[in-house]
């Protein structure tokens, strides 16, 4: 099967990127090397092509009324020009996807628009789940990314760089805020969408824009000596920041409470959503497994599938693991039996036939300086 390619694919080739198959897309794993790319984001700025991710548009008169049932979070808790991290759940409270939902406000007359930026591997599942269960013709569902690029600039200098490129300030936009507007002095190809969000633990922007404009933005960033970054650095950055990766840390057999995302579930509001009955019971009965952070002694890295033990007893399994360039420690996420999940509890991780001591920590291993 032919792999999908971003409109920026030619830039990968020019930059001698190392390419891999990721969720059916041919994507860069690295450009100049994972450590250099990681440190560029932590110390100044770096940028990522994230066009493999999906963007779903929901349009209608008050679309929140019709789509609320897909999300455990109260959609009326955020308003036009804002984004919200949330989940799509199945009937048993399992996580179909984690995503950010954006309220773009009115676009044409009384028609409002919502954007969902979803994981690459889950786009088709998300799209069909919503379309097949919407049960109304009052809201249209479509792909908002056709022939466009999703580019992410991350790091403490990201806002300044973007302001220089567009020629105006974005200081009025709050964290998780967004805008959807024309920049006619840059492009006449259509509106740009951008938000103050990211997947690195740093200040950052995610920008949906026409292909030629994305090429121009790439060239501008390179001219400012900003490092293009691949999926390798994106993974180490997100794990340091304590952020989940769907397919490793989240899946349809795992609930928000087990994943440490119970704060996204609003049971106080009366709105119905898929999985509510199951989650109400689980919130009362408790969970059997829990996602925790681990710091592993030495330099051995606990990768996905490594088993976790306590006093020779198997208690869980690692879902994500890496060497942290920032903390200079081996870090990981693991699902373990809840009775062993207390902070600072010392466990053992089996790595290539040898056990290494590990300490249970909070999942965020890094927090940026304010």
From Swiss-Prot:
Gene3D superfamilies from the UniProt entry: Aminomethyltransferase beta-barrel domains, Aminomethyltransferase fragment, Probable tRNA modification gtpase trme, domain 1
GO CC entries: cytosol; glycine cleavage complex
Domain of life: Bacteria
Pfam hit, one: GCV_T
GO BP annotation list: glycine decarboxylation via glycine cleavage system
GO MF term set: aminomethyltransferase activity; transaminase activity
EC number: 2.1.2.10
Enzyme class, broadest EC rank: transferase
Kinase listed as a keyword: no
Cited InterPro entries: GCS_T, GCS_T_bac, GCST_C, GCV_T_N, GcvT/YgfZ/DmdA, GcvT/YgfZ_C, TrmE/GcvT_dom1
Keyword Chloroplast belongs to the record: no
SUPFAM superfamilies per UniProt: Aminomethyltransferase beta-barrel domain, Folate-binding domain
Keywords, in A-Z order: Aminotransferase, Transferase
Reactions the enzyme catalyzes: N(6)-[(R)-S(8)-aminomethyldihydrolipoyl]-L-lysyl-[protein] + (6S)-5,6,7,8-tetrahydrofolate = N(6)-[(R)-dihydrolipoyl]-L-lysyl-[protein] + (6R)-5,10-methylene-5,6,7,8-tetrahydrofolate + NH4(+)
NCBIfam families: gcvT, PRK00389.1
Biological function: The glycine cleavage system catalyzes the degradation of glycine.
PANTHER family the record matches: AMINOMETHYLTRANSFERASE, AMINOMETHYLTRANSFERASE, MITOCHONDRIAL
Assembly notes: The glycine cleavage system is composed of four proteins: P, T, L and H.
Homology family: Belongs to the GcvT family.
Name used for this protein in its record: Aminomethyltransferase
Species annotation: Prochlorococcus marinus (strain MIT 9515)
């Amino acid at each position: 099967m032919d792999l999908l390619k971003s409109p920026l694919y030619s830039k990968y080739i020019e930059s001698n990127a190392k390419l891999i198959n990721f969720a059916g897309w041919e994507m860069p794993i690295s450009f100049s090397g994972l450590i250099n790319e990681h440190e560029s984001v932590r110390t100044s700025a770096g940028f990522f092509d994230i066009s493999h991710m999906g963007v779903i548009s929901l349009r209608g008169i008050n679309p929140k009324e019709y789509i609320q049932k897909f999300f455990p979070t109260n959609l009326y808790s955020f308003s036009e020009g804002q984004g919200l991290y949330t989940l799509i759940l199945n009937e048993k409270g399992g996580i179909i996807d984690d995503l950010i939902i954006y309220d773009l406000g009115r676009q044409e007359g009384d028609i409002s628009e919502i954007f969902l930026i979803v994981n690459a591997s889950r786009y088709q599942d998300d799209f069909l789940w919503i379309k097949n269960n919407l049960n109304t013709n009052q809201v249209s569902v479509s792909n908002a990314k056709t022939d466009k690029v999703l580019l992410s600039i991350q790091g403490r200098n990201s806002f300044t760089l973007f302001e220089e490129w567009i020629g105006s300030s974005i200081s009025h936009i709050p964290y998780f805020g967004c805008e959807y507007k024309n920049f006619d002095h840059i492009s006449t190809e259509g509106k740009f969408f951008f938000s103050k969000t990211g997947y690195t633990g740093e200040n950052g922007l995610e920008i949906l824009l026409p292909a030629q404009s994305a090429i121009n933005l790439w060239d501008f960033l390179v001219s400012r000596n900003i490092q293009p970054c691949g999926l390798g650095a994106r993974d180490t950055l997100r794990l340091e920041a304590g952020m989940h990766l769907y397919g490793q840390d989240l899946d349809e057999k795992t609930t928000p409470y087990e994943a440490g995302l119970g704060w996204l579930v609003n049971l106080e509001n009366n709105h119905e959503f898929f999985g509510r009955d199951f989650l109400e019971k689980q919130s009362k009965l408790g969970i059997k497994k829990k996602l925790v952070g681990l710091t592993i002694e030495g330099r051995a890295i606990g990768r996905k599938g490594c088993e976790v033990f306590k006093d020779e007893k198997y208690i869980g399994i690692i879902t994500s693991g890496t060497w942290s360039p920032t903390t200079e420690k081996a870090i990981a996420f693991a699902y373990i039996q809840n009775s062993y999940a207390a902070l600072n509890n010392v466990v053992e991780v089996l790595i290539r036939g040898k056990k290494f001591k590990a300490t249970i920590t909070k999942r965020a291993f890094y927090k940026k300086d304010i």
